[in-house]
């Protein structure tokens, strides 16, 4: 599992988020981060206090995104998996996305199709790629299609690395400032300016304007939308639960 390393000496079991963000010093910053942070879960009480007030949340994926921005060196690059909920989420998520697009160049979002992590979760996911040090001017989107004849992924027919050859050919090289201005739009690729993203309150869950939508009765189209609605409801409930928990904790401290 660890590429033939029988006894890894530099791997430890711990909660990275338990360390206060301010304690990560310049010597610990890195050039490249590739990660699939846990998502869909909530951190234990008190973990959020390790982060600045404007970013405090108990949602694991959100805190990891804040941590990544901290530990990347200037000019460093990151690629990570995040759920749709991060893209369309509001409140703390909006503030985190605003910081990301201000401090980093979020140049590419690869929108993965439904079922990539089946059977473990049906949550739709995305691949985000950014570099630190220059602000975002535009975000390129690439809608990863199913292979010919497929309508979903599963444990016996998972997504394969060979399917990303099209993205690799399209990717291209950035200019000296780190922007991908020479990329071409297509049926699966499009760009959105930072002004448009700001006017949409940093909602990054943007549809492909170049694709003809399926009919309203298409199950393969409706199911992901239904699942997204369920995720939005779950996030709202989690946010309300967290606010209620904080209010009760404050009341308890005030009466003790």
How would you describe each model-predicted region?
Residues 1-6:
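Short, conserved SAM-binding/catalytic segment
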Residues 9:
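Phosphate/diphosphate-binding loops
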Residues 13, 18-256:
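A conserved structural/catalytic subdomain of Rossmann-like adenosyl-cofactor enzymes
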């Amino acid at each position: 599992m660890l590429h033939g390393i029988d006894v890894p000496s530099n791997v430890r079991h711990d909660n990275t988020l338990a360390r206060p963000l301010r304690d990560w010093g310049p010597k610990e910053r890195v050039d490249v981060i590739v990660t699939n942070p846990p998502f869909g879960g909530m951190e234990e009480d008190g973990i959020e206090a390790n982060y600045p007030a404007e970013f405090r949340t108990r949602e694991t994926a959100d805190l990891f995104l804040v941590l990544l921005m901290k530990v990347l060196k200037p000019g460093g690059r990151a690629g990570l998996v995040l759920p749709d909920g991060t893209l369309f989420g509001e409140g703390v998520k909006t503030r985190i996305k605003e910081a990301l697009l201000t401090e980093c160049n979020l140049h590419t979002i690869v929108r993965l199709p439904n079922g990539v992590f089946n059977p473990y979760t049906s949550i739709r996911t995305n691949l985000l790629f950014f570099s630190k040090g220059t602000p975002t001017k535009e975000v390129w989107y690439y809608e990863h299609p199913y292979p010919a004849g497929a309508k979903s992924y599963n444990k016996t027919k998972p997504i394969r690395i060979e399917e990303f050859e099209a993205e690799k050919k399209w990717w291209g090289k950035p200019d000296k400032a780190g922007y991908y201005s020479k990329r071409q739009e297509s049926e699966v690729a499009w760009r959105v300016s930072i002004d448009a993203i700001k006017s949409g309150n940093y909602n990054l869950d943007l549809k492909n304007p170049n694709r003809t939508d399926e009919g309203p009765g298409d199950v393969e189209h409706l199911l992901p939308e239904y699942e997204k609605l369920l995720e939005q409801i779950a996030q709202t409930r989690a946010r309300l639960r967290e606010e209620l928990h904080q209010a009760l904790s404050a009341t308890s401290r005030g009466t003790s």
